[in-house]
Every structure is written in C-alpha cells, then in structure tokens.
Amino acid sequence: MADGWDAEKIFNTTVFGFTYDDLILMPGHIDFGVNDVDLSTRITRNLHVRTPIVSSPMDTVTEHRMAIGCALMGGMGVIHNNMETARQVAEVQKVKRYENGFILDPFVLRPSDSVADVYRIKEKYGYSSVPITDTGMLGGKLLGIVTSRDIDFLTDVHTPLSEVMTSDLVVGHEPVQLAEANELLRESKKGKLPIVNDNFELVALISRNDLKKNREFPLASKDSNKQLLVGAAVSTKPHDIERAKALQEAGADVLVVDSSQGDSIYQVDLVKRLKAAFPELQIIGGNVVTARQAKSLIDAGVDGLRIGMGSGSICTTQVVCAVGRAQATAVYHVCKYAREHGDVPCIADGGIQNSGHVMKALALGANAVMMGSMLAGTEEAPGEYYFHNGVRVKTYRGMGSLDAMRAGTRRTASPPARGLRSPEASPSTAASSGGASRASALSEASPSAKSEASRTSTSTGSAARYFAENQTIRVAQGVSGCVVDKGTVMQLIPYVIQGVKHGMQDIGARTLRDLHAQLVGGELRFDVRSGAAQREGDVHDLHSFERKLYA
C-alpha cells in the first residue's frame, strides 16, 4: 500500500536505528473533536495519570516544585536522589502535603505551647493553622485550633496557645466520607475542619485550600487519599535499601531505580528485595533499550520500564562508551516486548524536544514520556535564573556530568524521625503496622549486594547511576550547560498536551488504548523521512521568523 508502512515492517526490515525525526505519522479519518481526546494512561501496573508526562529525576529538573507542578497538570514528577536521604524524604513530603484529602498527620500542639511554636511551623513548613489537643499529638482530645487570625497582631510570642486558640469549633465526626466532610467545610465557611471520634479525639483534618485546588486543577494526579502523586529515585547501591524504605514511609507512590544501564545484577537484586519487603510498592526499572534488558527487569518484578540510553540532550554515553540505541527504535522494540510479556507500561525517556516527539513516542507504544530538557529552565526547575549573553537562562546538566557527580552530598542512612507535635522535626507520614517485618526483609543482604559492598556510602546518586562511585578517574557521560527560560510548567505542559491531542485527532485515535491498538493491528502508518523531507517539514524559506511555543 502506498499510504505509508506499518511499524513492524519499518523496524524489522532494516539494520538502521531510527530517531523520532526520522519518522512521520500518516493521517487517519477524523470523526471527533480535539477535546474528545483522552490521554489517560498508566505509568506502572497500578498507577494511573491523566497526562502522559513524567519529569526526569535530575538535580536541575525535579524537586518538590516541579513534582507539584507536573502532578497538578495531570502527570507526575520523580524527585532526584543526588542529595541526602533526609532531604529527599522532605521533598517527597512537601509534594504530599501540598494537597490532601484527609490530612492524617497534621502538625499538632498543646495548650501550653507558645505562639512562637506556631510561627516556627509556619516559617518552616508553610502551615498557619494548628489543632490543639491535650497531648499535643494526633489522637489527643481536641481543645481548639489556632489560625493566623488568632495570632496576627500579637507582640508577645511567648503567649500560651490556650489564651489565643479558638475553642468554639465546627467539626466532622468519624466515620465520614471525604465528600461529606468537604460539604460540611463549605457550609462552615471555615478554613479547616477537624475530624474527631466519639471521644472528641482528633483523628484527621481537612483544608479549604484543597477545595480551591480541586476546582483549579481538575486533571491533578492523586492517590487514594487525594494527595498528589510523586515518585522518587533510588540508586542500585546496597545501602539505598534504607533510602527506599524511608521514601516509601514518606509516601512516595513509586520508586524509580535510576541507572544508565538497567540490566545489572545490582538492579535485579534490588528490585527483588524491594518487592519482597513492599509487595504493593510500585517500582519502575531501567534504563533499557533492548528486549533482553527488559526481560531481566520484568522477570525481577518491575511495574514499569524507562526506555532510553544516550538519547538525552545532555547525555554523551553513546559518544563516550559507544553503547546505546536510537530512541525511536528502542521505544518500539522494548514496548513491543513489554506489551507481550505482562503488559508492563513503558516510559520513553530521552530525546523529547517538542510535542511532536511526544506524539511519536506514544505512537510507538510508550505509555508516557519522561522529560528533562523540555522542563529544565521553567520556573519550577531547581536553580536560579541568570543572564548569559543577554539571554535569561537556567543551568541544566546531565546526571553523568562531572558537575552533577561533584554536587552529590554524603548520604545519611535514614531520615530523622518526626514526632507529631514537634515543630522542629521533619514531617513524615506514620509508618505502617507491618514496618518491623518489612525492615527485617530489607536488612537481609543478597549475595550480589554483599559482593557490592565496596560501593561506598559516600558516593553520590549521580555517580551511582553511572557505576562511577568508587573510581579514581571518573569518565563523564554527560555535560553541563544552560537552557532558555521557558516560563512555568502550568503553561508549558498544557501546550505540549494540546499538540499531542491534535496529533491524536489527525490520525483518528481518541485514546492511547486506541492508538496502541492501531499500532499493533498495523492500521497506524508511518513514513521514513529523508534529511530533505525533515527540512521540508519544518519552517523554511523565510528571511527571519519568531518561534513562539504558546500564546
């Protein structure tokens, strides 16, 4: 047929590897509007999002602000691990605390505590409303609540809270559904609604701010408790078991095992041990570019795969090590294998430069894409803006760059514990009742973990990703640079998604399930483009022009 070629023919009858720009999709029949396109997808076996975008766990891309922004837009962020465990845990908790259903671990104080304690909580964590119980802990008898209105004009910060708290309270009584509690909160016109049991003991809290966020961000990715989804990266080092345990207890919805070459005994053993300790914890393995690599990780029990090796804009693995694969070819073959062996979701990681690349990655079988360079330079990315040759930019670097390896700090074995009433302690959700048995499962070192003991605990997450922690000479597999200011992800992600929706409409696929069905059935057609065809398909023959991403 002259109307293009199916993917099977393109990828299995040539010795060449293809990138996204080498391919173009053939149009289909349009019988629906662009607003009818649904991009809901899975990023692991059990984790669903409404936008197929995940931010990369890089130290110049994803910390809590980026993770919050991505989740509000319907995707998810993955907190990088080029930092101490305690700090990474705190980053995860900031995402989880940004939006809540029932707040099950609120900061709580006693009547004898002072106004200064409330100020410390507000300064450190941003919360200005604090329930007051007789014990200063969740589960104590509720006596009142202190809000910013109660203490705004007080000059004596040593004033006991018993003198300023509001004791005439509107409360919800357990058991209560979240919808009922939210309606009660609306009717009360209060900022917070404490939830109590029959003994008037505090069991939870809900916030009016969350009702506003629900209205403003209807696509937001949330867990069963209506908190934003967030992932966190861990390395394959043996002691990162403790990091993984701390992140799981902090509420991370998925752990991403961060390695440039995922088919290693270290990653296989780590995945098996994590699955033994936390059977319900979702784990994304990688990175992989071949079916053989994918098989190793799927057999180990991963719930999702990252695809890509050397295709990122700041990655030099293919040049330095001569190992990797063209990204479009890697995505097609790995996704095909994963689909046929357990239907494991795949994330295309690397090489994404525009919304068209996102569309092509999804069309080749990916369930979502992971973005680094496209999100770097946004307001939510870590780092400060500066001017380079008159252009406002932010630093962006590969995790294999020497700068990233040097930037890592010494890891701590575990984060500090947090008492529910202590304003100075790090916030965390309570550990589950099965914690002791899980900890013992984690502490049993596997043979390969013992053989890896020489991988010292002082190395950085970045160095561990490239197996370079204990090397006298570190070979960079990435570079450091800068990217232009892109504004906020609150505008960038909707622009990208709208472009993808138009692409879906053009080929006649309402959902990603429809798109993948067309791919498997051969109805989805592609052409391979020559260099001249690629130039023709972009802006050309103009004296000058201005390329704007969105209006």
Curated annotation (Swiss-Prot):
Entry-linked NCBIfam families: IMP_dehydrog
Primary site of residence: cytoplasm
InterPro entries xrefs: Aldolase_TIM (IPR013785), CBS_dom (IPR000644), CBS_dom_sf (IPR046342), IMP_DH (IPR005990), IMP_DH/GMP_Rdtase_CS (IPR015875), IMP_DH_GMPRt (IPR001093)
Protein purpose: Catalyzes the conversion of inosine 5'-phosphate (IMP) to xanthosine 5'-phosphate (XMP), the first committed and rate-limiting step in the de novo synthesis of guanine nucleotides, and therefore plays an important role in the regulation of cell growth.
Gene Ontology CC annotation, any one: cytoplasm
Catalysed conversion reaction: IMP + NAD(+) + H2O = XMP + NADH + H(+)
The keyword NAD is annotated on this UniProt entry: yes
Alphabetically ordered keywords of this record: CBS domain, Cytoplasm, GMP biosynthesis, Metal-binding, NAD, Oxidoreductase, Potassium, Purine biosynthesis, Repeat
Pathway: Purine metabolism; XMP biosynthesis via de novo pathway; XMP from IMP: step 1/1
GO biological process: GMP biosynthetic process; GTP biosynthetic process
Stretches assigned to the CBS domain: 102-163, 165-221
Record-level Gene Ontology MF annotations: IMP dehydrogenase activity; metal ion binding; nucleotide binding
Subcellular location(s) of the protein: Cytoplasm
Sequence similarity: Belongs to the IMPDH/GMPR family.
Enzyme class: oxidoreductase
Organism expressing this protein natively: Toxoplasma gondii
Cofactor: K(+)
EC number annotated for this UniProt entry: 1.1.1.205
Active-site residue numbers: 315 (thioimidate intermediate), 465 (proton acceptor)
Biased segments, Low complexity type: 422-462
Name used for this protein in its record: Inosine-5'-monophosphate dehydrogenase
Binding annotation for IMP: 313, 349-351, 372-373, 396-400, 477
Residues where K(+) binds: 310, 312, 315, 536-537
List of residues binding NAD(+): 258-260, 308-310
Keyword Lyase: no
